[in-house]
Amino acid sequence: MRYSLLAVAVSCTLVLTACNKSTDTTEPAADTSSSAAATTETTGNATTSTASATSGFKSAENIAMNITGAGASFPQPIYAKWSADYNADTGGQVNYQSIGSSGGIKQIQSKTVDFGASDAPMTPEELEESGLIQFPTVIGGVVPIVNIDGVEPGALKLDGQTLADIYLGKISKWNDPAIVAMNPDLTLPDAAITTVFRSDGSGTTFNFTDYLAKVSPDWNDTVGVDKTVKWPTSATGAGGKGNEGVSSYVNRMKNSIGYVEYAYAKQNNMSHTALKNAAGNFVQPSAETFAAAGDIDWSKQEGFYKVITNSETAQAWPIAAATFILVHKQPENPQQVAGVLNFFDWAYTQGDDDAMALDYVPFSDTAVALFKEKWNEVKGSDGQPVYKPAQ
């Protein structure tokens, strides 16, 4: 059942549930997989559920109920929660490995997983070359996080140019005049800033650097936008694997700054910053500000390729991002891919509460219908779609 997420003052076309919704420096270890057990039986090269068919998502013919995926760490918290609830509801098992967007793209291209996940959308040309489709699942936000004594979550204000200058190494101390000018009520230390960044290929990095390139000509000219970049502060900073690794480093390194998906900041009780957006307003990360940034017409985005950073909407969070799923259009294992679509069909239908609880923003019914229509391009050897969404 799909319904209104929030009373958000943004117009809605083909966008979000928020609108018009009907009913030391050793790499830290992290548990980066999400999996739920299932009661299954093997049928050919796929696994189908033996659960009683009390739900449209259970025990359907030619739909695998044991699927694997890999990729972005940005959505890992919601995919883990969805996986657990999907298992409880249907008996299906989803094993998702949080390895970074680059790894997810490589694995789906190599056909070693049933679906890939990336926060850096593939271009229409890249999708065509790889024989893939992509569709977004939720919108979230990339947030700067800091570890400064006495600075509470949301208290430190930064603008895009200052954030870029920190990661360029131009601003190296917390009491730099540019930071102090925006934070007259804070006592900031005369201490060196340690930058923390991703060491793996990352969609979170893609969106972070895309934002910095839009607000800083120096960043655009010297570093650019990508899932991996040459960090100007690498000699004095630290690289963490996944959002998990960045969170861990910032948590234990005083006077550090990093960037993670908002759920990681909340789950780890970390201090995020406020950011000045393109409209000139200092905003806090929240479902409302993410929704404001994602208020776009997805029907006009070829291949659903869209980067939503630096929105000019008045209350938009400046580093908002959609996260995407990748599957093959002509899969060698159609039952497995049907299982993937079944899982995300369930998530679109049943998973809004989970998403909202973690401050991700689900999509509107209209947008979801558009995404599901794209699934018709995923066909078996008989030329027919491998999956028909539940009614």
Task: Give the location of each predicted region.
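Bacterial N-terminal signal peptides that target proteins for export
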Residues: 1-6
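C-terminal motif of bacterial Sec signal peptides marking the signal peptidase cleavage site
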Residues: 14-18
